Swiss-Prot record:
Pfam families: ATP-synt_ab (PF00006), ATP-synt_ab_C (PF00306), ATP-synt_ab_N (PF02874). It catalyses: ATP + H2O + 4 H(+)(in) = ADP + phosphate + 5 H(+)(out). This is ATP synthase subunit alpha. The record marks S362 as: Required for activity. It comes from the Bacteria. F-type ATPases have 2 components, CF(1) - the catalytic core - and CF(0) - the membrane proton channel. CF(1) has five subunits: alpha(3), beta(3), gamma(1), delta(1), epsilon(1). CF(0) has three main subunits: a(1), b(2) and c(9-12). The alpha and beta chains form an alternating ring which encloses part of the gamma chain. CF(1) is attached to CF(0) by a central stalk formed by the gamma and epsilon chains, while a peripheral stalk is formed by the delta and b chains. Its main location: membrane. It is found in: Cell membrane. SUPFAM superfamilies: C-terminal domain of alpha and beta subunits of F1 ATP synthase, N-terminal domain of alpha and beta subunits of F1 ATP synthase, P-loop containing nucleoside triphosphate hydrolases. Keywords: ATP synthesis, ATP-binding, Cell membrane, CF(1), Hydrogen ion transport, Ion transport, Membrane, Nucleotide-binding, Translocase, Transport. Produces ATP from ADP in the presence of a proton gradient across the membrane. The alpha chain is a regulatory subunit.
């Protein structure tokens, strides 16, 4: 076989012509210490705060401490198989989560990966976990109601779209139950709900998801779960990830409700991370920026101006207190950040008052502007009536003789307290709330025995549905009780009472 030199020359020439020099520069560093989900890396000189770093075994980390000679970062995955001396690369990106319509109805972890066994989520858009809150000019006042379906809240502590309302109380007082009822009540109201579970037991999250599926609420809900078994960094970013998912819809002009359950565990996870990163501890061993941790999260809840689509993000953060102590560090921080709080009490819970809301110290600072006029008309005196009742009830314990007026106040208070009781997973439409509170506040239930109040309520609402549906429809449509409607409602109550008392 003859090989011509010219052929070899032409092949070499063509190879030289096609040769492309590819130089890829990667800013990399070396792990000098790793343990407890924290790594210290030497050599990442250009690293940004909050940047995503690539570790071996496809594990990523988030840079938090930028020190003179090393970078302190938290691992967003398992540290198994990673050791000192391994190489770490910069990605040049910050931590992002997938966002979009396809996440609705799914259960995801803090990084937006599905954990419900229903396969991958097909979405191309991502959004940074940490983003700056909307500015003053881009917002508008809270003026549209977000109905919870819970009589005590919608009447006395109304919540508006774009508000931050804290749910605070000891463990096992029904905090999550209020949040769940609020989510269930958004059915058909075109509100997207996000439930963020931070440091919860996996069995608890599974129970919540099952309830949402049974009540068909999962059709418009996203569940973000960072269970108690997850590492502190994943628990730390969970609420920010949920918030970014919600902001995507808010920026499209939609209304979003987000529940953070709960921020006490979130602060504990952040404290663990901070102490491992050797940041100086402050009060209750929390780091100095624990206020900023929650304020930058809750400030992202807003009602956007009409120019930006008028979308809203309403936040319901939950805080767990110890023995009712609201003066602890985290509770006082979050109370000062939010626009009001719903305070739940153990004593009320065990005395059968459920939801166990203490109306005396629960408040909504901006929700009053969002409350519908019909509710204002019937619930205006409710808080004062209950306050007078509580004051008299504690006085009456001593067995002193009471005058007629005081006895009447006590009797009315007992009935109002009974009316405000409500079973779980049974949120009530606002027009029904208005009708029953109209009967209660206008003294139409004074001759009904206390033990028959719940029976009266149920049968009265059934009666109104069957015989006077137009009254409920008018309240729903016009959101105000005119003199004419008031007379119709009075007559309907009188009619029903005759039947009820005869049957009784």
């Amino acid at each position: 076989m003859n090989v011509k030199p010219e052929e070899i020359t032409s092949i070499i020439k063509s190879q030289i012509e096609k040769y492309e020099k590819k130089i890829e520069t990667v800013d990399s560093g070396t792990i000098i210490q790793i343990g407890d989900g924290i790594a210290r890396v030497y050599g990442l000189n250009g690293c940004m705060a909050g940047e995503l770093l690539e570790f071996p075994n496809d594990v990523y980390a988030m840079a938090l401490n930028l020190e003179q000679d090393n970078v302190g970062c938290v691992l967003l995955g398992s540290q198994e198989g990673i050791k000192e001396g391994n190489t770490v690369k910069r990605t040049g990106k910050v931590v992002e989560v997938p966002v979009g319509e396809n996440i609705i109805g799914r259960v995801v972890n803090s990084l937006g990966h599905p954990i419900d066994g229903k396969g991958a989520i097909s979405t191309t858009e991502t959004r940074a976990v940490e983003l700056v809150a909307p500015g003053v000019i881009t917002r508008q006042a809270v003026k549209q109601p977000l109905q919870t379906g819970i009589k005590a809240i919608d009447a006395m502590i109304p919540i508006g779209r774009g508000q931050r309302e804290l749910i605070i109380g000891d463990r096992q007082t029904g905090k999550t139950a209020i949040a769940m009822d609020t989510i269930i009540n958004q059915k058909g109201k075109d509100v997207i709900c996000i439930y963020v579970a931070i440091g919860q037991k996996q069995s608890t999250v599974a129970h919540i998801v099952n309830n949402l599926i049974e009540t068909n609420a999962m059709d418009y809900t996203i569940v973000v779960s960072a269970a108690a078994s997850e590492s502190a960094p994943l628990q730390y970013i969970a609420p920010y990830a949920g918030c970014s998912m919600g902001e995507y819809f808010m920026n499209k002009g939609k209304d979003v409700l987000i529940v953070y359950d709960d921020l006490s565990k979130h602060a504990v996870a952040y404290r663990a991370m901070s102490l491992l990163l050797r940041r100086p501890p402050g009060r209750e061993a929390y780091p100095g920026d624990v206020f900023y941790l929650h304020s930058r999260l809750l400030e992202r809840a807003a009602k956007l101006s009409d120019k930006l689509g008028g979308g809203s993000l309403t936040a319901l953060p939950i805080i767990e207190t110890l023995a009712g102590d609201v003066t602890a560090y985290i509770p006082t921080n979050v109370i000062s950040i939010t626009d009001g709080q719903i305070f739940l009490e153990t004593e009320l819970f065990y005395s059968g008052q459920r939801p166990a809301i203490n109306a005396g110290i629960s408040v909504s600072r901006v929700g009053g502007n969002a409350q519908i006029k019909a509710m204002k008309q019937v619930a205006g005196t409710l808080r004062i009536d209950l306050a007078q009742y509580r004051e008299l009830a504690s006085f009456a314990q001593f067995g002193s003789d009471l005058d007629k007026e005081s006895k009447r106040t006590l009797e009315k208070g007992k009935r109002l307290t009974e009316i405000l009781k409500q079973p779980q997973y049974k949120p009530m439409a606002v027009e029904k709330q208005v009708m029953i509170l109209f009967a209660a506040s206008r003294n139409y239930i004074m001759d009904i025995p206390v033990e028959r109040i719940s029976e009266f309520e149920e049968e009265f609402l059934d009666y109104m549905d069957t015989h006077h549906r137009e009254i409920g429809d008018e309240i729903k449509e016009k959101q105000v009780i005119s003199d004419e409607l008031s007379d119709k409602l009075r007559n309907a109550i009188e009619e029903f009472k005759k039947i009820f008392l005869i049957e009784g």
